[in-house]
Swiss-Prot record:
Keywords: ATP-binding, Ligase, Nucleotide-binding, Protein biosynthesis. Heterotrimer of A, B and C subunits. Pfam families: GatC. One of its GO terms (biological process) is translation. NCBIfam families: gatC. Its EC number is 6.3.5.-. The keyword Nucleotide-binding applies. It comes from Thermobifida fusca (strain YX). It catalyses: L-glutamyl-tRNA(Gln) + L-glutamine + ATP + H2O = L-glutaminyl-tRNA(Gln) + L-glutamate + ADP + phosphate + H(+); L-aspartyl-tRNA(Asn) + L-glutamine + ATP + H2O = L-asparaginyl-tRNA(Asn) + L-glutamate + ADP + phosphate + 2 H(+). PANTHER family: GLUTAMYL-TRNA(GLN) AMIDOTRANSFERASE SUBUNIT C, MITOCHONDRIAL. It comes from the Bacteria. This is Aspartyl/glutamyl-tRNA(Asn/Gln) amidotransferase subunit C. Belongs to the GatC family. Allows the formation of correctly charged Asn-tRNA(Asn) or Gln-tRNA(Gln) through the transamidation of misacylated Asp-tRNA(Asn) or Glu-tRNA(Gln) in organisms which lack either or both of asparaginyl-tRNA or glutaminyl-tRNA synthetases. The reaction takes place in the presence of glutamine and ATP through an activated phospho-Asp-tRNA(Asn) or phospho-Glu-tRNA(Gln).
Length: 99
């Protein structure tokens, strides 16, 4: 017997604004039941003597200094552009066109 019912799946689908065909509700209920069972098994194993972690390996962020470095001049940036107009990249218009 599923821990989650067909009606609960339909309710969740409505909350998520998903249109689910009636014939998929039983299948999804069974799949969600498998997922819920797997999570329950993990909860059984993860008792209070095991500290919670967000990652299996202890990782720390390595930051580099935020230093200003020379970049391209506007002329260098536009040098290889296929089209330039008024000191800017010229690109085809895409908004407002009928497609």
């Amino acid at each position: 017997m599923s821990a989650i019912t067909r009606d609960e799946v339909a309710h969740l689908a409505r909350l998520a604004r998903l249109a689910l065909p009636e014939d998929e509700l039983d299948q999804l209920a069974a799949q969600l039941d498998v997922i819920i069972s797997a999570v329950a098994k993990v909860q059984e194993v993860a008792k209070g003597d095991i500290p919670p972690t967000s990652h299996a390996l202890p990782l720390t962020n390595v930051y580099r200094p935020d230093e200003v470095k020379p970049g391209l001049t506007p002329d260098q940036a536009l040098a290889e552009a296929p089209a330039v107009e008024d000191g800017r990249f010229r690109v085809p218009q895409i908004l407002g066109e009928e497609g």
